[in-house]
Amino acid sequence: MSKPLLDKTLFKKTLDVVGVRVEAKKIGRVVKKLHGHLLNLPRLRNVVPDPTNPDPYKNSSSKLILLNSKVKDMETLQPLNEDLVAFLKEESLAFVSHAIELDYSYFAVDQVLSELLPKGMDIPSSFETVGHIAHLNLRDNQLPFKNVIGQVILDKNAQIRTVVNKTDNIETKFRTFPMEVLAGDDDMEVEVHESKASFRFNYAEVYWNSRLQQEHLRIIRQIKPHDVVCDMMCGIGPFAVPVALNGSKVYANDLNPRSYHYLKENIALNKVEKLVTAYNLDGRDFLAKLLSEKKQFTQVLMNLPAIALEFLDAFPGQFDHWEGELPFVHCYCFSNADDVKQDVKQRAEKIMGGELDPERTSFHLVRDVAPKKVMVCISFQLPESIAFSSERQASKQDDPKRRKVAAENAA
């Protein structure tokens, strides 16, 4: 099968319609009478200058009111009803043939591609937008036509300068993926705006998903200015920077050196240097560093759904020095189980070696990522039985104040 050429002359078409020549002062009344019978096509006006006027684009004495394509005969004006035809003739209005010239620029993406792609092939008219980049995930049968698809999307979206296609799955430890430029500039440096923050980054070097904007906002709204946030897998800062803009202190970490680079750039860009401290460590090492330095935090974010659950093994028995309430943890993961909540809860408990308190555990289904596979956020307050070592738990049991409270409760 040969791939199609983008021949824009294929889309030159003439649309012949009936026009009603009307004096300018009568236009409003006649348009109202013709409601339901007017030309109704995207981006086309149904009241246009009268081409018979010497200078039709200036205030002239007449205009053309264009009827929809069902009205073909200027003599009978069918399917207009008799009363409407009588009204038009009583007004002594003239009926003329009017040609509308259409070309490639008029037609939408799906209309163009439906002409260029084989019959029955899905039209890839939806895509993720990241700054000036359109990101496609083309199917195998669409790949022979990838360049023409890219060119059409580029032509039809004024804000797009680059069209890329993912060529393989996300399999790197930094969650980046291989891509190829289908059309436009080979420019991966983008700037996006989200949650009242600005972010700059190279789309080929870091992970960014515009479809997670609402999920970012959901968590950001939960975090209050008095909170201190430990963001273990922060990327370029979609959580860290906005919560800092809201007044929270943040310890933000990412293993990818390029994410770390852009994280620091975005911290400076948004002027939150005094509130965000950036780290470039493995997530477990980062948590251990904060705990060894006796840093206190109230919220922990773990946004690496492919493996974040595994990092919960860094929590058990590491909080013996802790003062006050233990932090809340928000951990993202994938699940393909029938009972998603039970599956995620059991996996988290198995990794941490203890049970979560049902009263302090909640779940949020973020989005479907594949058939029978969902992205989930489990949120829970870290239980004492997991956070503290057996020695710390034993010492708490022997605490005189705790024994007194227990005795009073038993009385």
Swiss-Prot record:
Disulfide bonds: none annotated. Keywords: Cytoplasm, Methyltransferase, Mitochondrion, Nucleus, S-adenosyl-L-methionine, Transferase, tRNA processing. SUPFAM superfamilies: S-adenosyl-L-methionine-dependent methyltransferases. Residues 391-411 are annotated as: Disordered. It comes from the Eukaryota. Monomer. It is found in: Mitochondrion matrix; Nucleus; Cytoplasm. One of its GO terms (cellular component) is mitochondrial matrix. GO terms for biological process: tRNA N1-guanine methylation. It catalyses: guanosine(37) in tRNA + S-adenosyl-L-methionine = N(1)-methylguanosine(37) in tRNA + S-adenosyl-L-homocysteine + H(+). Its EC number is 2.1.1.228. HAMAP family: TRM5. S-adenosyl-L-methionine binds at H216, D254, L255, D282, G283, N303. Specifically methylates the N1 position of guanosine-37 in various cytoplasmic and mitochondrial tRNAs. Methylation is not dependent on the nature of the nucleoside 5' of the target nucleoside. This is the first step in the biosynthesis of wybutosine (yW), a modified base adjacent to the anticodon of tRNAs and required for accurate decoding. GO terms for molecular function: tRNA (guanine(37)-N1)-methyltransferase activity. PROSITE patterns: SAM_MT_TRM5_TYW2 (PS51684). Belongs to the class I-like SAM-binding methyltransferase superfamily. TRM5/TYW2 family. This is tRNA (guanine(37)-N(1))-methyltransferase.
